[in-house]
Amino acid sequence: MSEITISRPYAKAVFEFAIEHNTVASWQSMLLYASKLNSNPYIAKLLSSTVITNTKIADIFIAVCGNKLDNYGRNFIRIMAYNRRLLLLPDILKIFLQLCKKNSSTIEVEVITVSALTNNQIAQITQAMRQRLSQKVKLNCIIDLSIIAGMIIRIGDIVIDSSMLGRLERLGTHLST
């Protein structure tokens, strides 16, 4: 099985835990330190040893990390050592960073209407776009009287046109063909 495939559930679990406990930055630094420690040839030899018990490997690794790990970080290292997965820490860090990037990315959605939207309408549109795009959404509301009624939603190249002007233009195109 691929190291990335094995690493993904660990990275996802750590990421979800970090989000839930609002400790993403500290987990990022713990994983970064532990991953750098893996690049040490002596540590790498220790981690791949079949003679030393998993518990002893975890104890040594945690001792070397010192105060760089909190209680949750130490528990994570123990779980990784028990399952003989400490060599996967660089891959786990890589996936964790990808999840952080994806989570922090916010997509801008432009909403064009004839009149100002109410707070309730803004909340409904934001929620619908968040569900559809599976990302955080930032709404930019624009007032344009030329659309007559309805709204136009722009998400990058995608345009959802439910304006009266758009409908009239489509009707005109349909009638002229």
Swiss-Prot record:
InterPro entries: ATP_synth_OSCP/delta_N_sf, ATPase_OSCP/d_CS, ATPase_OSCP/dsu. The keyword Membrane applies. GO terms for molecular function: proton-transporting ATP synthase activity, rotational mechanism. It is found in: Cell membrane. Coiled coil: none annotated. Pfam families: OSCP (PF00213). It is a peripheral membrane protein. PROSITE patterns: ATPASE_DELTA. Keywords: ATP synthesis, Cell membrane, CF(1), Hydrogen ion transport, Ion transport, Membrane, Transport. F(1)F(0) ATP synthase produces ATP from ADP in the presence of a proton or sodium gradient. F-type ATPases consist of two structural domains, F(1) containing the extramembraneous catalytic core and F(0) containing the membrane proton channel, linked together by a central stalk and a peripheral stalk. During catalysis, ATP synthesis in the catalytic domain of F(1) is coupled via a rotary mechanism of the central stalk subunits to proton translocation. PANTHER family: ATP SYNTHASE DELTA CHAIN (PTHR11910). NCBIfam families: ATP_synt_delta (TIGR01145), PRK05758.2-2 (NF004402). Belongs to the ATPase delta chain family. F-type ATPases have 2 components, F(1) - the catalytic core - and F(0) - the membrane proton channel. F(1) has five subunits: alpha(3), beta(3), gamma(1), delta(1), epsilon(1). F(0) has three main subunits: a(1), b(2) and c(10-14). The alpha and beta chains form an alternating ring which encloses part of the gamma chain. F(1) is attached to F(0) by a central stalk formed by the gamma and epsilon chains, while a peripheral stalk is formed by the delta and b chains. This is ATP synthase subunit delta. It comes from Baumannia cicadellinicola subsp. Homalodisca coagulata. The lineage of its organism: Bacteria, Pseudomonadati, Pseudomonadota, Gammaproteobacteria, Candidatus Palibaumannia.
